[in-house]
Amino acid sequence: MENLNLNKHISGQFNAELENIRTQVLSMGGLVEQQLTDAITAMHNQDSELATRVIEGDSKVNLMEVTIDEACVRIIAKRQPTASDLRLVMAIIKTISELERIGDVADKICRTALEKFSHQHQPLLVSLESLGRHTVQMLHDVLDAFARMDLDEAIRIYREDKKVDKEYEGIVRQLMTHMMEDSRTIPSVLTALFCARSIERIGDRCQNICEFIFYFVKGQDVRHMGGDALEKLLIASDXKKAK
């Protein structure tokens, strides 16, 4: 794993503790990415066995969040980190919360697939698979950016969510047209819309992780900035990089 050039501490154990927590976060991220990938596959292929495995695996994601959270609390209490060390710990705490919620989405997709969908709904699921693959790639990329605290990559991924939003809007229009043409499909279309919205929200979760990377690197909290203000800040960051 790439070293972040963390502050050198008198206690080498402190560095080891921080690196260990980062490693755990990336392990959790890898598990969540696999859970999401499997959930999309299970939904598209109507694979009940795979869907069941994803549902059962959600408890492991939850346990990892609790374990990492407790480790962060111990570091804060024991080491009283400051500056970039404190920002790293806080970014980790917030990131694992987002990862756990993405894991919940994978769980919900599988439960919905088991309870609501059948092979006759396959045409409705094709576009959802495409959206799902897009968000899986976003998650993969943001985990890589988090591993390196790569601000440039985080900015690129942040902007990628606009493409996810447009894809989601297209799916909504398609599903609404399908429903208006055949009222018998209303229940299944509404379920597909619920799944599409849940998948689209993964892009928002990835955006949040990008904001935590920005916070660690720049020391600035951008979570509640308006879209225009944040875009100006990102453009300014791009301009500094180009100089």
UniProtKB/Swiss-Prot annotation:
Task performed by this protein: Part of the phosphate (Pho) regulon, which plays a key role in phosphate homeostasis. Encoded together with proteins of the phosphate-specific transport (Pst) system in the polycistronic pstSCAB-phoU operon. PhoU is essential for the repression of the Pho regulon at high phosphate conditions. In this role, it may bind, possibly as a chaperone, to PhoR, PhoB or a PhoR-PhoB complex to promote dephosphorylation of phospho-PhoB, or inhibit formation of the PhoR-PhoB transitory complex.
Gene designation per UniProt: phoU
Tagged with keyword Transport: yes
GO cellular component: cytoplasm
Molecular function via GO: protein homodimerization activity
Organism: Serratia marcescens
Pfam families on file: PhoU
Record InterPro entries: P_transport_PhoU, PhoU-like_sf, PhoU_dom
Taxon lineage: Bacteria, Pseudomonadati, Pseudomonadota, Gammaproteobacteria, Enterobacterales
NCBIfam families, A to Z: phoU_full, PRK11115.1
Keyword Cytoplasm in annotation: yes
Subunit structure: Homodimer.
Main location: cytoplasm
Similarity annotation: Belongs to the PhoU family.
Name of the molecule in the record: Phosphate-specific transport system accessory protein PhoU
Annotated compartments: Cytoplasm
One example of a Gene Ontology biological process annotation: negative regulation of phosphate metabolic process
Keywords from the UniProt entry: Cytoplasm, Phosphate transport, Transport
